Amino acid sequence: SSCFAIDHKKVKWFGLDRCATDTEAPTGVYHDGAYCPVCHAPMEYEYVHYNHIGAYRCTSCGHARPDPDYAATELDLQNGKLILDGQFTVALAFRSIYNVYNILAAYAACRECGVEGAAIADTLSSYILKNGRMQTFTLGQHHGTLLTSKHENSIAYDTNLRYIASTNEDCTVLIIVDAVSRKYFTSETSWLWDIDFDQLNVPHVKRVILSGMYRNDLAERFRFTGVQNWEVIPGIPDAAAAIRDSGSEALYVVTCFSDRDKLLNLPDVKKEG
């Protein structure tokens, strides 16, 4: 997208300034932004928000991150606070880096349409997605959050795994791959190797359960991670029952739109909101 409308006069840019969760270099399994999309020379980064998103600059032609017209100037994910253009505060209902980009895009579009910044920030504060990408529920004594991640899209997975790793609360993680795509049938799962599952190798993730038709593909992928406390439970109902009957820690479910209702529609799962 950094190449869209290069040198066009009617372009407005939005972006996130440097924040506490940034890294000095990309940290994923692979690097999408290693080479310049203009001249194909190596790229360098001042900081990285996630994957290839951050302050980039080509070492050859100078293609670089534009100065944003609208910016998230301060971000505190731990306390759920976002400041836009240095003055408008948004309370984050969901404390994830990609949610910040969604908010920032909406803010920029509304400002271009003439809406006052304070009104936008007030409307966006504590906004909860209603499109099913995030669903809270209870299962037994567990409070659960389902994080929809597009299969065949490692960035979607990585950002959700990063969110789980950032919570610092004891939890179980259930990963379901039962259908690869809603649009077509395929059993191709090489995309699992592009996902940084090692993000779950943190002390507060007490248990990782792999379930669904492609649980063995997931298991093979996990054998090449540092995560030790994973197990396979083939059927989704059986996985849910095993979680229901044990413990009360937080529960995070990572799966796609095709598979989400296979869990949420189970009798023991009580959706919230």
Question: Predicted regions span which residues?
Answer:
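ATP-dependent carboxylate-amine ligase
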Residues: 30-33, 37-43, 50-65, 108-115, ...
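Generic secretory/membrane-interface signal
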Residues: 11-14, 96, 172
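Short glycine/threonine-rich catalytic loop with a Thr-x-Gly-x-Asp
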Residues: 28-31, 94-105, 131-132
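Helix N-cap / loop-to-helix initiation motif
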Residues: 99, 116-117
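Extended acidic/charged loop-beta regions that coordinate divalent cations
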Residues: 2-91
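Glycine/charged-rich beta-loop-alpha catalytic/anionic-binding loops adjacent to active sites
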Residues: 84-92, 137-144
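A short local loop/turn or secondary-structure capping micro-motif enriched for an aromatic residue
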Residues: 21, 100, 153-154
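A short, sequence-level motif marking secondary-structure junctions
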Residues: 91-98, 148-152
